[in-house]
Amino acid sequence: LHYQGAYAEDHSTFNEVVVTATRTNSQIEDTAASVAVVTDKNIEESMVTGLDDLFEYMPGVTVKTNSRQGVQSINIRGIEGNRIKVLVDGVSQGNQFESGNTFINSARVNVDTDLIKAVEIVKGAASSLHGSDAIGGIVAFETKDPADFLKGRNFGGHAKFNYSSEDNTFSESVALANKTGDLESLVAYTRRDGNELDNFGDLADASTEANNLLVKLQYQVNDAHRVEFNGNYIRNKGNGKQSYNGYTNATSEDVTEQYQVGIKHIWEMQTALADSLTWQLDWLSKEENGITDRVKGQNIQRKDYIYEDEGYQFDSQFDKYLSLGSTEHYFVYGASFSDKDIKNVNKEYNSASANKEIFYIPSASERRYGLFLQDEITVGNFTITPGVRWDAFETDPGDTSSNPSGNAASDYKKFSDSAFTGRLGSVYKLNEQHRLFAQISQGFRAPDFQELYYSFGNPMHGYIFKPNPDLKAEDSISYEFGWRHNNDISSSEVSVFYSDYDNFIESKTVSGTWTPVTDPAIQQYVNIGKATIKGIEFSNQLSWNKFMPIEGFSSRVAAAYTEGEDGNNNPLNSVNPWNLVAGFNYDSEQNWGTTLTINYTASKDKSDINDDKVLPISAATVVDITAYYKPIKDLTLRAGLFNVTDEEYYNWNDVRDLQTENKDLTQAGRNWSITAKYEF
């Protein structure tokens, strides 16, 4: 399904083309899965300034943040973190790393929203095409290409300025694209500078800066060959005051630095083997550096923690179309390989005691191999798509002889496993306007570095965290059925889904009584058993031109309701309250327009929380108003007033472990934003 925001200027339908769900160019109405699309137009019209805004109007999709490092992961239908595969230009992003404290963490994704062309969200298991980590879905970001600025010309670009009062952020973006012969190029840069969120709490002073540089070269060698080079550099920095029990004068500095470089080759080979071959080779390197300064008594302490994730990825795909009698076949098959290393070094400097150096995860390495095959079979109005994939993975903990966590080096072992996953999807075209779709899909997720090897010894305080290389891979099976309607004034979708998950991995206390030294608690990541998630989603978009005396009115509405239980029939806290978004648009023929959005989120009651100590949250209704004006063809001015009624509310993902009220975690109060963008 396309983006469920309330947007003006463009009436979208299910004609939107998606790639990620099937690895083919398919219109949404012909896709046997629930797929959402956010376009660059949607991002502009909603005045999105960060990942925390990107999915705000999309029921069933949310983000999880922490107060120090910001957005950490994306939640789809109650599944999040490393259970959601995140791609940027086809490149799988680094693992989310949660250290158990605020000193060092690594987010699942870092991308600037000004440089996004489209985001595809595949809801539900998708491992048969994309392998491990897609057990709960996929979020695929596509950055802008030179052609998006050139628009048939030899030169183009934009200059953009934005200010947002919610965190006093100024952002500037510039893009330059050029075409010389068959070579197209793009250089784009975005800079953001801001402060702490202006919410209903009393947040300490903080400052943030973000830099994103995107470079692309695309060369059409001839009719059969196209080569593309891309580079993406990100550097984000945050400084702020912190609070730790027993410490004073605590401050932090967090720096994220990421490089992504790749080459892609598209070959229209037109042979018996395949009609086309697409392959890409990419290198991704990400480093998180967290520095914490604090004072306790006479001791001045500095924690300098580093987490690195670096590796290569290769992906290839062959496409082949065949017509056999009364059936049409579209085959997609290929292979993938990845090799990456993880490093974590935590240094502690003390003025009045000994310095320390520890790690949460040893310097480990991982290799993954994958083979996949899919056949899209069309017979008349019926399309059925079977697919299968094989994956193998190997993880090596490296040298753990200097392990300072209190665990023996023999506790860290190599890990390897393999898995087959399948998918069967179908679409039945009732007529030109109505379609039914259904799919059964399997998912799996190999244990990640953190789950296999995380360790930390603190027996003096009554606990030791031990590695567990005996984990099993998580697996799932998902069922979905839906109906779509699409015509020239309206589009609708209703889908119901049910997913079973097995061998879920979570951290648990496996023994011990939390008695310091003599009987500390032993904690590990373990396979805890089963979980079930089910729900229903609905959306509708309608142009009112045939019903109103004045043209330009349209509306959109979307809702998502999800339930989740573990194997003991206890509610899953990762499932968000049900959500409804309604938007009403008016676009004048005089180059201006406005949008009113109402975003309702239900309460999270104690009966829906698997912990009596966690605080429930109240329902909230948030109203946003945006408007645009084009004084000349290439200049667009926008203004927005958000949370018009100054509603005090929480994002459930951010407070689902909270046992006492903390208004520092509330969302922004009434705030405003302005944007000016000039295209040339």
Roles of regions detected by a PLM:
Residues T102, S128, A140, P146-D148, ...:
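Periplasmic-side early beta-strands and strand-to-turn transitions of outer-membrane beta-barrels
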Residues D10-F149, N168, F481:
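Acidic, small-polar-rich N-terminal luminal/periplasmic segments of exported/outer-membrane proteins
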Residues Y247-A272, Y307, Y360-E366, Y412-T421, ...:
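Outer-membrane beta-barrel signature, preferentially recognizing the C-terminal barrel domain
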Residues G194, F200-G201, A206-T208, A224-A274, ...:
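Flexible loop and strand-edge segments within Gram-negative outer membrane beta-barrel domains
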